[in-house]
């Protein structure tokens, strides 16, 4: 009898130890994964003493992202000037003209003075879906109605066709298919409204180039991660199309030259919906500011980080995380498009 009791006690002890081990492993996994907010941050969340010296050196070499909370023509001018960049030739200013009737596109009164001072041309491409911007005639009317033609020339880059710029070493796509008029410009200001997006999670500098500079067939090509150039922009592999966006932007950077392109994001009217939506949801989050950089990855990462820190961010965070939006930045950094580590500089300090 004693022998039987001993065996039973031994089995109980073994089961207890096994359960304890499982809980420890579970805890280890939870700790390693971190919170969504931690994963969103471009810089390291935790740092050991041994890493501090290396981290300090990395941060010292990190690209600058310039910031102002002043969302006004003078604030926009100030962050632009902080870039210490001047176009050397004909300047294209890439914006989204916005889908009618009520999208949150950047207003003429905000961006007009800067664009005029630079003698820039507002450039866009037609869309690859229905709506008011799928044909040149309709799109030109939208540009006029939304005030873009009141302060600058307006160029639909795909109006006379398209051209291809190669992607070097792409996993998803091997070319960018852009409007043919893109060849007419030597310098580029990518002026983006940062906001949520139903398919990408968020839209900023990377999306404004990857989709905005693409011709309609180029848009389908990126959305389908290189599988087709006609048909629907709907896709089945979310990460693949996010990766295709990053690869498309490398083609643009390589073709025009990194020194010929800069990026500005305006963080106002932060709806969960893109400016391609004519009936966007009202924002729950307050306006944040204007940011500028020569690095599109650092710029979009800084904007995401500010969203994670902001009050009223629940709906926008849900949209970003539902679509795995941060993977765009992870992959873009991996392929050398830019850095998720950056130095944020307030131009008003």
Show where each model-derived region lies.
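Extended, low-polarity segments enriched in aliphatic/aromatic residues
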Residues: 57-113, 117-349
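Positively charged n-region of N-terminal signal peptides that target proteins for export
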Residues: 1-9, 21-22, 303
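Short, low-complexity, disordered segments immediately C-terminal to signal peptides
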Residues: 21-46
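Post-signal-peptide N-terminal segment of Sec-exported extracytoplasmic proteins
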Residues: 42-58, 86
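C-terminal motif of bacterial Sec signal peptides marking the signal peptidase cleavage site
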Residues: 15-19
């Amino acid at each position: 009898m004693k022998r039987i009791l001993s065996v039973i006690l031994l089995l109980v002890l073994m089961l207890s130890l096994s359960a304890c081990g499982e809980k420890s492993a579970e805890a280890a996994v939870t700790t390693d994964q971190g919170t969504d907010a931690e994963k969103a941050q471009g810089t390291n969340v935790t740092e050991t003493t041994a890493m501090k010296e290396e981290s300090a050196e990395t941060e010292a070499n990190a690209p600058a992202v310039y910031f102002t909370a002043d969302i006004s023509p003078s604030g926009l001018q100030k962050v632009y000037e902080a870039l210490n960049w001047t176009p050397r030739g004909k300047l294209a200013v890439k914006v989204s003209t916005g889908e009618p009737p009520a999208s949150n596109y950047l207003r003429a009164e905000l961006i007009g003075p800067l664009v005029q001072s630079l003698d820039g041309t507002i450039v866009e491409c037609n869309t690859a879906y229905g709506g008011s911007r799928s044909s040149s005639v309709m799109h030109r009317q939208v540009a006029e109605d939304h005030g873009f033609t009141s302060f600058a020339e307006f160029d639909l880059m795909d109006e006379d066709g398209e051209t291809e710029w190669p992607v070097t070493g792409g996993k998803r796509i091997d070319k960018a298919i852009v409007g043919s008029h893109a060849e007419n410009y030597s310098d580029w200001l990518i002026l983006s409204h940062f906001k949520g997006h139903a398919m990408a999670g968020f839209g900023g500098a990377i999306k404004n180039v990857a989709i905005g500079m693409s011709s309609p067939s180029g848009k389908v090509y990126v959305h389908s991660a290189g599988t087709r150039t006609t048909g629907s922009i709907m896709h089945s592999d979310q990460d693949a199309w996010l990766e295709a966006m990053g690869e498309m932007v490398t083609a643009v950077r390589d073709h025009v030259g990194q020194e010929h392109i800069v990026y500005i994001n305006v963080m106002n009217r932060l709806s969960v919906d893109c400016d391609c939506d004519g009936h966007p949801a009202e924002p729950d989050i307050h306006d944040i500011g204007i940011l500028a950089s020569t690095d599109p990855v650092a710029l979009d990462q800084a904007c995401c980080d500010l969203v994670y820190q902001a009050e009223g961010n629940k709906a926008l965070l849900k949209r970003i995380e539902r679509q795995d939006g941060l993977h765009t930045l992870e992959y873009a950094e991996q392929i050398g498009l830019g850095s998720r580590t950056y130095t944020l500089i307030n131009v008003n300090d």
